Amino acid sequence: MESANASTPAKTIDQLCKECNLSMHSLQILCVFCRKTLSTAEVYAFQYKSLYIVWRGQFPFAACACCLEIQGKINQFRHFDFAGFAVTVEEDTKQSILDVLIRCYLCHKPLCEVEKLRHILQKARFIKLNSSWKGRCFHCWSSCMENILP
C-alpha cells in the first residue's frame, strides 16, 4: 500500500485513507511493534489521538492499543527526565500549561484543558520523558490511580 504521492507520504490515518481512496472503517493496517492488524476501533483511536503513521519500506504502520501502552511504560523507565507541577512545565516551556502539547504517557492521547486542570487541582505531577511533557488522560487516570488507592 504505497502512498499515491511518493514525495510526501501520508502522515496520518486520515491522509492515508484519502490518498488510497479508502474509508477508515475498511483500512487494514499493521501494528509497527507486534505486526497484528489493528481493529477498526484501534484505527479510529489512532486517528483520534493525532498520532502519525510510520513507513517501513513502502508500507505504512500504526500502533495497536496494547503496544502503545507497553511503549508508554517502557518510555517511563528508559527516558524519564524529571517530574514537576504545572508551574515547572510553564517555566520549562515558557508557555501557559494550556498551550503546551502534553500527551498521556500511557495511551498517548493529547491532554485537553480539563485534563491538564485536573492535574493542577489534584496536585498531580506531569513527567518529562525524552524532552516531552506527559500526563494522564481521564481514561488512564483511574487505571494509574488504582494501585495507590486503599
Curated annotation (Swiss-Prot):
Gene3D superfamilies: E6 early regulatory protein (3.30.240.40). It comes from the Viruses. The keyword Oxidoreductase does not apply. One of its GO terms (cellular component) is host cell cytoplasm. SUPFAM superfamilies: E6 C-terminal domain-like. The keyword Transcription regulation applies. It is found in: Host cytoplasm; Host nucleus. GO terms for biological process: DNA-templated transcription; regulation of DNA-templated transcription; symbiont-mediated perturbation of host apoptosis; symbiont-mediated perturbation of host ubiquitin-like protein modification; symbiont-mediated suppression of host innate immune response; symbiont-mediated suppression of host type I interferon-mediated signaling pathway. One of its GO terms (molecular function) is DNA binding. Pfam families: E6. Its main location: host cell. A zinc finger (unnamed) spans 31-67, 104-140. Keywords: Activator, DNA-binding, Early protein, Host cytoplasm, Host nucleus, Host-virus interaction, Inhibition of host innate immune response by virus, Metal-binding, Modulation of host cell apoptosis by virus, Transcription, Transcription regulation, Viral immunoevasion, Zinc, Zinc-finger. InterPro entries: E6, E6_sf. Belongs to the low risk human alphapapillomavirus family. The cancer-causing human papillomavirus E6 protein has a unique carboxy terminal PDZ domain containing substrate but low risk E6s do not possess this domain. Forms homodimers. Interacts with ubiquitin-protein ligase UBE3A/E6-AP; this interaction stimulates UBE3A ubiquitin activity. Interacts with host TP53 and EP300; this interaction inhibits TP53 activity. Belongs to the papillomaviridae E6 protein family. Plays a major role in the induction and maintenance of cellular transformation. E6 associates with host UBE3A/E6-AP ubiquitin-protein ligase and modulates its activity. Sequesters tumor suppressor TP53 in the host cytoplasm and modulates its activity by interacting with host EP300 that results in the reduction of TP53 acetylation and activation. In turn, apoptosis induced by DNA damage is inhibited. E6 also protects host keratinocytes from apoptosis by mediating the degradation of host BAK1. May also inhibit host immune response. This is Protein E6. It comes from Human papillomavirus 13.
